[in-house]
């Protein structure tokens, strides 16, 4: 009986190990597919904000603040313009701009946008690791419109509707996303309570076609 139980246990372990081994050797080119999109929206657009760990939801600094909290727009009385460029390794660049303006009374409007782009990259595959001779482009971009208003001298709210798109090697995907924020000044020195919800929107999937090749693993 003990021998039978041991045999069953060993067989079960072998089956589990075989199933796990298949996950250790995924099909080449398919690793970590579909994990996340539009991750460029996590890139900071202000040197000051990045230096503070991007804990700037309550910081009414300049026009770039609407990227972190749309409600800040109602705290900027004058017309503000912010422009930045970030140069990453491998010739990757991120350009950003934002502008805010007081419409009338306690109503404010702003625009912002960013584009992550790179030089054409040589296409490589499992069969041609040194390159196929073809080149492809990659680009992420967004453009947003922000509206904010002062409800009282201490409380304001704001929202941003933005269109986000990605193009990579002939594949395209896009979506509309929403940012919302609130700003409340307590009246005690610089103590503020703020909240911000960023990049809330629909599910996104790429458009286009692709060719799937499975290598012989034997």
Stretch-by-stretch model annotation:
Residues 2-10:
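Sec-dependent signal peptide recognition
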Residues 12-21:
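Hydrophobic h-region of N-terminal signal peptides that target proteins for export
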Residues 22-50, 59, 86, 93-218:
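Outer-membrane beta-barrel porins/channels
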Residues 46, 75-78:
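A short, polar/charged loop/turn motif at coil->beta-strand junctions and beta-hairpin connectors
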Residues 54-57, 79-89:
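Short strand-turn segments of transmembrane beta-barrel domains in outer membranes
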Residues 64-75:
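N-terminal periplasmic accessory domains that precede
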């Amino acid at each position: 009986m003990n021998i039978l139980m041991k045999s069953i246990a060993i067989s079960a372990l072998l089956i589990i190990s075989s199933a796990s081994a298949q996950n250790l050797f995924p099909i080449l080119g398919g690793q970590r597919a579909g994990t996340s999109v539009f991750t460029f929206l996590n890139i900071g657009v202000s040197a000051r904000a990045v230096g503070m760990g991007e804990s700037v939801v309550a910081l009414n600094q300049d026009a770039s603040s609407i990227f972190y909290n749309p409600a800040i727009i109602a705290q900027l009385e004058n017309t503000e313009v912010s422009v930045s460029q970030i140069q990453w390794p491998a010739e990757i660049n991120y350009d950003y701009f934002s502008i805010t303006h007081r419409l009338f009374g306690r109503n404010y409007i702003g625009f912002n946008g960013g584009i992550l782009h790179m030089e054409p990259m040589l296409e490589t595959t499992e069969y041609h690791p040194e390159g196929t001779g073809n080149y492809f482009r990659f680009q992420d971009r967004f453009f947003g419109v922000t509206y904010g208003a002062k409800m009282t001298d201490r409380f304001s709210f704001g929202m941003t509707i933005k269109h986000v798109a990605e193009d990579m090697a002939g594949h395209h995907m896009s979506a509309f996303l929403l940012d919302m924020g609130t700003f409340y000044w307590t009246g005690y020195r610089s103590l503020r309570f703020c909240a911000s919800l960023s990049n809330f929107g629909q599910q996104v999937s790429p458009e286009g076609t692709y060719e799937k090749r499975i290598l012989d693993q034997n």
